[in-house]
Swiss-Prot record:
One of its GO terms (molecular function) is gamma-tubulin binding. Changing R333C: In CDCBM15; uncertain significance. Component of the gamma-tubulin ring complex (gTuRC) which mediates microtubule nucleation. The gTuRC regulates the minus-end nucleation of alpha-beta tubulin heterodimers that grow into microtubule protafilaments, a critical step in centrosome duplication and spindle formation. Plays a role in neuronal migration. Disulfide bonds: none annotated. It is linked to Cortical dysplasia, complex, with other brain malformations 15: An autosomal recessive disorder characterized by global developmental delay, variably impaired intellectual development, speech delay, facial dysmorphism, microcephaly, and varying degrees of cortical malformations including pachygyria, thin corpus callosum and subcortical band heterotopia. Most patients have generalized seizures. Belongs to the TUBGCP family. GO terms for biological process: brain development; cytoplasmic microtubule organization; meiotic cell cycle; microtubule nucleation; mitotic cell cycle; neuron migration; protein-containing complex assembly; spindle assembly. Ubiquitously expressed. It comes from Homo sapiens (Human). This is Gamma-tubulin complex component 2. GO terms for cellular component: centrosome; ciliary basal body; cytoplasmic microtubule; cytosol; gamma-tubulin complex; membrane; microtubule organizing center; nucleoplasm. Keywords: Cytoplasm, Cytoskeleton, Disease variant, Epilepsy, Intellectual disability, Lissencephaly, Microtubule, Phosphoprotein. The lineage of its organism: Eukaryota, Metazoa, Chordata, Craniata, Vertebrata.
Length: 902
C-alpha cells in the first residue's frame, strides 16, 4: 500500500469514527508504517477467525452466508479483514466505542431520512380477480419484468464499463455492437420462453405407454440440452442471475421423471454457460474474458457434437433414457465446472487480472481431480494469453497497450518536465502505478519487479532509444510459477542494466552530483570566496531591491575566475531568491497536512522583510532523465543545506571583518581596554562557535556521507537503489545538520541573529572611531604645516590619535552604554548556546544521535560551558532554598545539584 493510500484511508477512518483533535493522522500513519507485517493466509487461520466472529455475532448464519458470498466473488483481502475483525472481538474497550459510534451514526442517518420521508397512499383494487388469474398474471409479469430488468441491468453495466474505459483511453474509444445484436434473443442460443419446438398440441403424456413416454422424454431432453424447450420439459423464466429451472410434466411416470431431474442440471449449466459466453463477448468486458468465452465456446461445441451424436442414436431407436444418462455423465462434470466458473466471474464482476486469479485459484483447488484440473488449466491458459501479450510488451519493450484497462500496471498522463518544476510532482511514483485488483494471484510476488522493469525501459524509450530485450521469450501460463518467474527476472536484470548504464555513462549522473556538491555543499571554497567578495554588497539589500540579472552576472564572473571554470556543468547553476526564510521553508516541508502548515498557508509572504542574504539560494537545471534522481524534492533538500551553510559562512565573514577592524583598538588607553577585551572575547567565542559548527557539518557529516553515497552508487544494481541511496544521503545530511528538528533550528537561528547584531554593533562603533581618527589626522596635518620637527611630528601623530580614540571610547561608554550592550550580547549568546547544548545533549541520548554528541564535544571542548551551566543551576537552587543561619560548627558541604536545561 502506497503512502498516499495510507494517508487517505487513515483520514477517512478518523472521519467515520468522528475523531477530532488529538494526535492527528500523522501519528497513526507513522505507527502503521513502522508496524506493517505481511499477513500470510492459511486455511486454519482463516477458519479460526471465521468461527470466532460467528460465535461473537448475534446472527452467525447471516455472517457465514455473507462470508461465503464474498468468497465466491473472489474478494481481495477478505481473509486478512476477517482476521482483523476477529482480533477486534477480543478488545472490549474498542468494541464498546465502535458500538456507541455506530449507534450515534445510525441515529443521525435516521434523523436525516425521517426529515425527507413522505407518506405513500396505495389505492384499493377496483375489482377482484380469482386466485388462478392472479397466478397466471404473476407469471406473465414476472417473465416480462425479469427479462426486461435483466436486460436493462446488463445494458447499464456495459455502459458503465464503456464510459470508464473511454475515460482512461481518451484517444481510443471502444467499438459498440449494433443494436440488433441485443434485440434478437434467438441469436443468443439460450431458451426462448414461450417458444416450443412445434405448434402442434402435445398429447397428454400420462395417457401414453411407458415406452412411448420414455421416447418422448428422450426427444425433449435432447432439445433441452441445446437450449430449446420441449413438449413436456420446458425452461422457467429466470429470476435475476439464478440458475435455470425447468418445469416437467407432472403426469410423467415417476421413475422416468426421476431420471429426467438427474439430467436437467446439464441443461441448466449449458444455459448459464451460453449466457455467459454471449454476455462476455461484448467489447466492454476485456480481452481476458473474451478469450475465456472463446475457450468455453469451444467446449460448448463439443457438447453440441455429443448431443447430435445422441440424436442420431435416438433416430435409430438405439437411445434409451438409461443410455442417455450414461452417455451424458462426462459432459455433466464439464458443464458443471464451466457453469460454476461463469457464475463466480459474474458474481465477482471480474475483469482482466481478477479473472485470471479466480481461474488460477480454482485450478489449484482441483488438485487431486486430474480431469477437472486439466479443464481449468486449459481455460486459464487460453484466458491468460492476451494478458501475457500485454505483459510481454511491458517487460520487454516498456510499452503499455491496454485498451480495456485489464493490466496490473496503469498509466497516468503526467508531463516529465514538471519533475523539475513542481515540488509535489511524483512522475517516477505516479506515472505508472500498480492496480491491485488486476494482479493475477500467481504474479503477486513479482508485481513490483514487473512494474520496475517496464518503468526502466520506458525511461530509455522516452529519451529516444529503442530497446528490445534480447532474452525475450513467450510467456505461457503454467502451475509451475518458476517458469515465468525466471523470465521476468531476466527481463528485470536487463532493464536495470540498460537504464543504469544509460544514466551513469551517457548522462553522467555521478559527474552531475559532484557538480551539485561543489556549489550547494561548498565543496571548493575559492569559488565561494570570489562570489561573496563580488556579491555581498548586492545581497545586503532587501529582496525587492535586488536585481537578479546583476546577481547572475556576478555568479558568472565568479565561476570564470575560480577553479569552477573547469566544471563542464557550471552553466546549469542558477540564482534563486526564495520568498521565505530557511525556517519557514523547513516547516513547510516538515509540516505537510498539519495545523502549522495550514496556518502558514494563509500567511502573507510580504510580512517578512527578507534581506538578500536570507533569501539567497542556488538552483540547478536538471534535464530528463536525470530529473528522476535529481528531482525538485532533492533540489529542495540541497537548497536547505546550502542556505544553512551559506548563512553560517556569512556570519563567519562578518565576525572576521570585525576582527580585522578591531586592530585599531590596540591603540586604546588602558582606561578602555577592560571593556574592549570583553567585546573581543565575545567575538572570539562567536567565531569559535560558527567555525566549529561549519567544520562539523562539512567534515563530519557531509564528506563521510558523500563517500558512502559514492560507494553505494558503484554497487547499485538498479535505478531504484540509486534513488534510495541519494535520498538517504540527503536525509542523513539534513538530520545531522539539525535541519529536521525545528526546535534545534530555531535556537541555532537565534544564535546566528545574536552574532549578526553583535557584528553590526561593533562595525558601527569601529566606523565611528575611524571617522574620529581621520578628523584627528587632519588636525595633526595642520600642526605639521606650522613647522614641527619630523620625529616630534610622528610622536605627536600617535599621541593625538590615541587621545582622540580614548576620548571617543570613553564618550561612547558614557553616552550609549557600550559596556552594558556588550554584556547583554554576552548574556544572550551564552543563554542560547547553553540552551542549544542542553537540547543537543537530550537528543543525543534519547534518539541515539551520536553525531550530535560530537557537536557538544567540539563546542565545549574544555568544559567551559558545562561549568557555567552547573554554576547557573547552583545559583538557581540556592535562590530557591531558604537561608537558615548556622550557630556553630563548620559549614556543611554544598549538595551536588543535577544540571538541567532551563
Amino acid at each position: 500500500m502506497s503512502e498516499f493510500r495510507i494517508h487517505h484511508d487513515v483520514n477517512e477512518l478518523l472521519s467515520l469514527l468522528r475523531v477530532h483533535g488529538g494526535d492527528g493522522a500523522e501519528v497513526y500513519i507513522d505507527l502503521l508504517q513502522k508496524n506493517r507485517t505481511p499477513y500470510v493466509t492459511t486455511t486454519v487461520s482463516a477458519h479460526s477467525a471465521k468461527v470466532k466472529i460467528a460465535e461473537f455475532s448475534r446472527t452467525p448464519e447471516d455472517f457465514l452466508k455473507k462470508y461465503d458470498e464474498l468468497k465466491s466473488k473472489n474478494t481481495r483481502n477478505l481473509d486478512p479483514l476477517v482476521y482483523l475483525l476477529s482480533k477486534l472481538t477480543e478488545d472490549k474497550e474498542t468494541l464498546q466505542y465502535l458500538q456507541q459510534n455506530a449507534k450515534e451514526r445510525a441515529e443521525l442517518a435516521a434523523a436525516a431520512v425521517g426529515s425527507s420521508t413522505t407518506s405513500i397512499n396505495v389505492p384499493a383494487a377496483a375489482s377482484k380477480i380469482s386466485m388462478q388469474e392472479l397466478e397466471e398474471l404473476r407469471k406473465q409479469l414476472g417473465s416480462v419484468a425479469t427479462g426486461s430488468t435483466l436486460q436493462q441491468s446488463l445494458e447499464l453495466k456495459r455502459k458503465m464499463l464503456r464510459d470508464k474505459q473511454n475515460k482512461k483511453n481518451s484517444g481510443q474509444h471502444l467499438p459498440i455492437f449494433p443494436a440488433w445484436v441485443y434485440e434478437r434473443p434467438a441469436l443468443i442460443g439460450d431458451f426462448l420462453i414461450g417458444a416450443g419446438i412445434s405448434t402442434d398440441t402435445a398429447l397428454p403424456i400420462g395417457t401414453l405407454p411407458l415406452a412411448s413416454q420414455e421416447s418422448a422424454v428422450v426427444e425433449d431432453l435432447l432439445y433441452v440440452l441445446v437450449g430449446v424447450d420441449g413438449r413436456y420439459v420446458s425452461a422457467q423464466p429466470l429470476a435475476g442471475r439464478q440458475s435455470r429451472t425447468f418445469l416437467v410434466d407432472p403426469n410423467l411416470d415417476l421413475s422416468i421423471r426421476e431420471l429426467v431431474h438427474r439430467i436437467l442440471p446439464v441443461a441448466a449449466s449449458y444455459s448459464a454457460v451460453t449466457r455467459f459466453i454471449e454476455e462476455k463477448s461484448s467489447f466492454e468486458y476485456g480481452q481476458v474474458n473474451h478469450a475465456l468465452a472463446a475457450a468455453m465456446r469451444t467446449l460448448v461445441k463439443e457438447h453440441l457434437i455429443l448431443v447430435s451424436q445422441l440424436e442420431q442414436l435416438h433416430r435409430q431407436g438405439l437411445l434409451s433414457l438409461q443410455k442417455l444418462w450414461f452417455y451424458i455423465q462426462p459432459a455433466m462434470r464439464t458443464m458443471d465446472i464451466l457453469a460454476s466458473l461463469a457464475t463466480s466471474v459474474d458474481k465477482g464482476e471480474c475483469l482482466g487480472g481478477s479473472t485470471l486469479s479466480l481461474l488460477h485459484d480454482r485450478s489449484f483447488s482441483y488438485t487431486g481431480d486430474s480431469q477437472a484440473q486439466e479443464l481449468c488449466l486449459y481455460l486459464t491458459k487460453a484466458a491468460s494469453a492476451p494478458y501475457f501479450e500485454v505483459l510481454e510488451k511491458w517487460i520487454y519493450r516498456g510499452i503499455i497497450h491496454d485498451p480495456y484497462s485489464e493490466f496490473m500496471v496503469e498509466e497516468h498522463e503526467l508531463r516529465k518536465e514538471r519533475i523539475q518544476e513542481d515540488y509535489n510532482d511524483k512522475y517516477w511514483d505516479q506515472r505508472y502505478t500498480i492496480v491491485q485488483q488486476q494482479i493475477p494471484s500467481f504474479l503477486q510476488k513479482m508485481a513490483d519487479k514487473i512494474l520496475s522493469t517496464g518503468k526502466y525501459l520506458n525511461v530509455v524509450r522516452e529519451c529516444g532509444h529503442d530497446v528490445t530485450c534480447p532474452v525475450a521469450k513467450e510467456i505461457i501460463y503454467t502451475l509451475k510459477e518458476r517458469a515465468y518467474v525466471e523470465q521476468i527476472e531476466k527481463a528485470f536484470n536487463y532493464a536495470s542494466k540498460v537504464l543504469l548504464d544509460f544514466l551513469m555513462e551517457e548522462k553522467e549522473l555521478v559527474a552531475h552530483l559532484r557538480s551539485i556538491k561543489r556549489y550547494f555543499l561548498m565543496d571548493q571554497g575559492d569559488f565561494f570566496v570570489h562570489f561573496m567578495d563580488l556579491a555581498e554588497e548586492e545581497l545586503r539589500k532587501p529582496v525587492e531591491d535586488i536585481t537578479p540579472p546583476r546577481l547572475e552576472a556576478l555568479l558568472e564572473l565568479a565561476l570564470r575566475m575560480s577553479t569552477a571554470n573547469t566544471d563542464p556543468f557550471k552553466d546549469d547553476l542558477k540564482i534563486d531568491l526564495m520568498p521565505h526564510d530557511l525556517i519557514t521553508q523547513l516547516l513547510r516541508v516538515l509540516a505537510i497536512e498539519t495545523k502549522q502548515e495550514k496556518a502558514m498557508a494563509h500567511a502573507d509572504p510580504t510580512e517578512l522583510a527578507l534581506s538578500g542574504l536570507e533569501a539567497f539560494s542556488f538552483d540547478y537545471i536538471v534535464k530528463w532523465p536525470l530529473s528522476l534522481i535529481i528531482n525538485r524534492k532533492a533540489l529542495t533538500r540541497y537548497q536547505m543545506l546550502f542556505r544553512h551553510m551559506f548563512y553560517c559562512k556569512h556570519v563567519e565573514r562578518q565576525l572576521c571583518s570585525v576582527w580585522i577592524s578591531n586592530k585599531t583598538a590596540k591603540q586604546h588607553s588602558l582606561h578602555s581596554a577592560q571593556w574592549f577585551a570583553g567585546a573581543f572575547t565575545l567575538r572570539q567565542r562567536m567565531l569559535n562557535f560558527v567555525q566549529n559548527i561549519q567544520y562539523y557539518m562539512m567534515f563530519e557529516v557531509m564528506e563521510p556521507t558523500w563517500h558512502i553515497l559514492e560507494k553505494n552508487l558503484k554497487s547499485a544494481s538498479n535505478i531504484d537503489d540509486v534513488l534510495g541511496h541519494h535520498t538517504g544521503f540527503l536525509d542523513t545530511c539534513l538530520k545531522d545538520c539539525m535541519l529536521t528538528n525545528p526546535e534545534l533550528l530555531k535556537v541555532f537561528s537565534k544564535l546566528m541573529s545574536v552574532c549578526v547584531m553583535f557584528t553590526n554593533c561593533m562595525q558601527k562603533f569601529t566606523q565611528s572611531m575611524k571617522l574620529d581618527g581621520e578628523l584627528g589626522g587632519q588636525t595633526l596635518e595642520h600642526s605639521t604645516v606650522l613647522g614641527l620637527p619630523a620625529g616630534a611630528e610622528e610622536r605627536a601623530r600617535k599621541e593625538l590619535a590615541r587621545k582622540h580614540l580614548a576620548e571617543h571610547a570613553d564618550t561612547v561608554q558614557l553616552v550609549s552604554g557600550f559596556e552594558a550592550t556588550i554584556n547583554k550580547f554576552d548574556k544572550n549568546f551564552s543563554a542560547h548556546l547553553l540552551d542549544l547544548l542542553a537540547r543537543l545533549s537530550i537528543y543525543s541520548t534519547s534518539d541515539c544521535e551520536h553525531g550530535m554528541a560530537s557537536v557538544i564535544s567540539r563546542l565545549d571542548f574544555n568544559g567551559f560551558y558545562t561549568e557555567r551551566l552547573e554554576r547557573l543551576s547552583a545559583e538557581r537552587s540556592q535562590k530557591a532554598t531558604p537561608q537558615v543561619p548556622v550557630l556553630r560548627g563548620p559549614p556543611a558541604p554544598a549538595p551536588r545539584v543535577a544540571v538541567t536545561a532551563q
